[in-house]
Amino acid sequence: ASNDPLIRQRLADAWIGLKVMRVNALRMLEHQGADLNREALISKLYWSNWHRDLGKLAMDILGNEAELIESAPYELTRMQKWYLFARADTIYAGSNQIQRNIIGERGLGLPKEPR
């Protein structure tokens, strides 16, 4: 995988995304007590997408081994569990679509989406 330029680029993107989340978390800590609702909503959306993409990257690095099970009857590997759990990150605490609507309506003051 380290010889694949696309995998290397995705690893770099994941590292950068992690650094972005760290800086944003530190910035939010610095402004404790302030109204950070918009930032919190954006952070949740960013994190859930980052985590999902990182799980997909892990599966792509494993290649065909990502589809193998460890033992009978059916035991997922740690990476397989992580990948499947990361998919849920985009759903619980509000799906990404709902998060985008909330960011637009509450954070940016856009008109409500017709229901």
Residue ranges and their predicted role:
Residues 1-115:
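Alpha-helical interface subdomain recognition
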